[in-house]
Design a protein with these regions (language model features):
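N-terminal subdomain of lithium-sensitive/metallo-dependent phosphomonoesterases centered on the IMPase/IPPase/PAP
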Residues: 1-104
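DPxDG-like acidic metal-binding loop motif
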Residues: 94-151
Length: 152
């Protein structure tokens, strides 16, 4: 509770709620994928050189849109994007967190009804870093939160 953590502002909970809402939207897209013709390749490769799936692109857009609108998020980094997205300048220091994610891990399993999910990690944004991107290069022990949402 907030009484147990006097420095808590609710910002982390607000970010987790964006991830939760994103997961509900993505789960619905995965569930209805065959019906609305969003299975298969999107026609581009991701940064690892893998063929991007249509649902990879859709899931990435959902997460970027919802996380980008949350106060407290400074940087968002996705497996589907070559560069991290800096949400906004933050002269007041209110944007305290970086969110890293794979929007649809295992998307190549969709054609065979294999399991897919979203992997995420939340780190504190280091405003003292020489480059904003350096905030993303932290050991796992520095994670504030991390998780995997399994869709099926």
């Amino acid at each position: 509770t907030q009484m147990e953590s006097p420095g808590a502002t609710g910002t982390l909970s607000w970010i987790l709620s964006a991830l939760s809402i994103s997961a509900k939207i993505i789960a619905n897209k995965v569930r209805c994928a065959r019906l609305v013709d969003v299975l298969g390749e999107a026609g581009a490769d991701n940064v690892q050189g893998e063929a991007q799936q249509k649902l990879d692109v859709i899931s990435n857009q959902v997460l970027l849109r919802l996380l980008g609108g949350r106060e407290g998020v400074a940087i968002v980094a996705s497996e589907e994007n070559e560069e991290p997205v800096i949400i906004r300048d933050d002269p007041t220091g209110e944007r305290r967190y970086c969110v890293l994610f794979d929007p649809l891990d295992g998307s190549s399993n969709l054609d065979v009804c294999g399991g897919v999910g979203t992997i995420f990690s939340i780190l504190r944004h280091d405003r003292r870093a020489a480059r904003a991107h350096d905030s993303l290069l932290q050991p796992g022990t520095q994670q504030v939160a991390a998780g995997y949402v399994l869709y099926g």
